[in-house]
């Protein structure tokens, strides 16, 4: 005799007869409702782009953070529940520091992503907890640029270019047509911004976009100010206008 669906909903540790964990699926829905975040690799490094439009004129825009420094050579973008994201970002920073103290060397991007996925997976198999309603894009440079996505289930995937959040489908479709392995840094930046514009179906405003990157030559995370972003946004908006007319 099978439990009604409500029974499987309440029990995170119980599979439904067709092999589903409903709470994990609901956590993925929380990510789909989140703001879009994009990651893209290029020859010179890896770039993260996040939508940080505010929903109220009373909100201090400077307090909204969507891209985080994890270590000198690693950054992360989030989409989903903000409080859950903060917990995972803190966890990632701690793991990076533990590795430095233990081995006297920086953690690799893949190892950090695996540790975060292991942590997330634990919250899918124990009673009294729920899955994290957030996905992370973890980006950085070891010997070469790396870009990983962590799923609420704890799954880990590596990408050349991808997105999380409500604009994922539009961005993925665009990247599948336009992405190339030999992109320069500037071209990758513009391509990522065009994808963001298509995801929100609007031209971009530099103040509403957060951008961070790590380059191969110095392996150091850097943020892009709205002033520095303007020439890239102007180039992207020309293409966005063309594509939105079609």
Curated annotation (Swiss-Prot):
Keywords per UniProt: Cytoplasm, Proteasome
Family annotation (InterPro entries): Ntn_hydrolases_N (IPR029055), Proteasome_alpha (IPR050115), Proteasome_alpha-type (IPR023332), Proteasome_asu_arc (IPR019982), Proteasome_asu_N (IPR000426), Proteasome_sua/b (IPR001353)
Intrachain disulfide bonds: none
GO molecular function annotation: threonine-type endopeptidase activity
Lineage top rank: taxon: Archaea
Main localisation: cytoplasm
Oligomeric and partner information: The 20S proteasome core is composed of 14 alpha and 14 beta subunits that assemble into four stacked heptameric rings, resulting in a barrel-shaped structure. The two inner rings, each composed of seven catalytic beta subunits, are sandwiched by two outer rings, each composed of seven alpha subunits. The catalytic chamber with the active sites is on the inside of the barrel. Has probably a gated structure, the ends of the cylinder being occluded by the N-termini of the alpha-subunits. Is likely capped at one or both ends by the proteasome regulatory ATPase, PAN.
Function: Component of the proteasome core, a large protease complex with broad specificity involved in protein degradation.
GO CC annotations on file: cytoplasm; proteasome core complex, alpha-subunit complex
Regulation: The formation of the proteasomal ATPase PAN-20S proteasome complex, via the docking of the C-termini of PAN into the intersubunit pockets in the alpha-rings, triggers opening of the gate for substrate entry. Interconversion between the open-gate and close-gate conformations leads to a dynamic regulation of the 20S proteasome proteolysis activity.
UniProt cross-references to NCBIfam families, sorted A to Z: arc_protsome_A (TIGR03633), PRK03996.1 (NF003075)
Localization (cell): Cytoplasm
This protein's record includes keyword Cytoplasm: yes
Similarity field: Belongs to the peptidase T1A family.
Record-linked PANTHER family: PROTEASOME SUBUNIT ALPHA/BETA
Protein name: Proteasome subunit alpha
């Amino acid at each position: 005799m099978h439990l009604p669906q409500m029974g499987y909903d309440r029990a995170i540790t119980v599979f439904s007869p067709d092999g589903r964990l409903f709470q994990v699926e609901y956590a993925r829905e929380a990510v789909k409702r989140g703001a879009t975040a994009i990651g893209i690799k290029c020859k010179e490094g890896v770039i993260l782009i996040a939508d940080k439009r505010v929903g109220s004129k009373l909100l201090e825009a400077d307090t909204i953070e969507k891209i985080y420094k994890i270590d000198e050579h690693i950054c992360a973008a989030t989409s989903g529940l903000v409080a859950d994201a903060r917990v995972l970002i803190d966890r990632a920073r701690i793991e990076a520091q533990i590795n430095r103290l233990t081995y006297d060397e920086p953690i690799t991007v893949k190892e950090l992503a695996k540790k975060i996925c292991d942590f997330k997976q634990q919250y899918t198999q124990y009673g009294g907890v729920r899955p994290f309603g957030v996905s992370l894009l973890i980006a950085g440079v070891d010997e070469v640029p790396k870009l990983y996505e962590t799923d609420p289930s704890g799954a880990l995937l590596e990408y050349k270019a991808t997105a999380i959040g409500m604009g994922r489908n539009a961005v993925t479709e665009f990247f599948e047509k336009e992405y190339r392995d030999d992109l320069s840094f500037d071209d990758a930046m513009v391509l990522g911004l065009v994808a963001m514009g298509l995801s929100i179906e609007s031209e971009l405003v530099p103040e509403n976009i957060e951008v961070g990157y790590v380059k191969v030559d110095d392996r150091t995370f850097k943020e892009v100010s709205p002033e520095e972003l303007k020439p890239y946004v102007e180039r992207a908006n020309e293409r966005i206008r063309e594509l939105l007319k079609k």
